[in-house]
Amino acid sequence: MPLHFKQLGHGEPLVLLHGLFGSGDNWFGVAPKLAEKFHVLIPDLRNHGHSPHHAEMDYPLMAADVEKFFSAQKIESAHVIGHSMGGKVAMQFALDFPARVKKLVVVDMAPRAYAPAHDKIFAALLALDLKLFQTRAEIEAALASEISSLNLRRFLLKNLSRDAHGKFVWKMNLRGVAENYSRLGEVLNAGNPFAEPTLFIRGGRSDYINAADEVAIHHQFPAA
């Protein structure tokens, strides 16, 4: 699958992978700084942003998408940073295509299964009949009863776009992602350990990585 992407800077290639409900644009708070030393490439993963929609979605498929992206951009190997869902894609990519990854950084994600935590968000978004709304503010207000966080609502609504008739549509394949959501919580398909330097970063208030995860981390990523 050909992935939409943006790029900036010069130097060694650095590929940034975004999280669930996100897009490559989420990285532009830090990308310009990274671009002072690296050639930064920021793809939208399948079913997100401006990349193609597909009925199937899991980590081996997304890792294969990234490998094809490397080939299309003539990248032999690169540093890879992934956040959240993108962190799992980055880990799967490193395990499946180790020669493609020089160094790996995983932000707020461990190589284990996670219980569903976004069902309420999917239900709230899928319940919206977008053709009934004229403004983003109206949509945000309609979500407020189900999604209390203003910052989260605004993040989710970055997925809105308008079609040729000026009507709101989702850029991401919302229903497709929802139908594959259980697969996104699954444990990685582990082959041989990834032996290159790896860094795991945990948010100070996050429980996505905990002390119990260190065994699995060091088993699959011994240089972490």
Segments the model singles out, each with a brief description of its role:
Residues 91-96, 100-135:
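Flexible "cap/lid" loop of the alpha/beta hydrolase fold
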Residues 1-15, 35-38, 75-76, 221-223:
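Alpha/beta-hydrolase fold catalytic core
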Residues 11, 19-23, 84, 204:
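Active-site glycine-rich loops that stabilize anionic/oxyanionic intermediates
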Residues 116, 131-188:
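Conserved alpha/beta-hydrolase catalytic His-Asp/Glu region
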Residues 21, 45-49, 111:
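Alpha/beta-hydrolase active-site loop signature
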Residues 8, 28-35, 41-85:
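Active-site loop/oxyanion-hole signature of alpha/beta-hydrolase fold enzymes
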Residues 164-221:
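Conserved serine/cysteine hydrolase catalytic core
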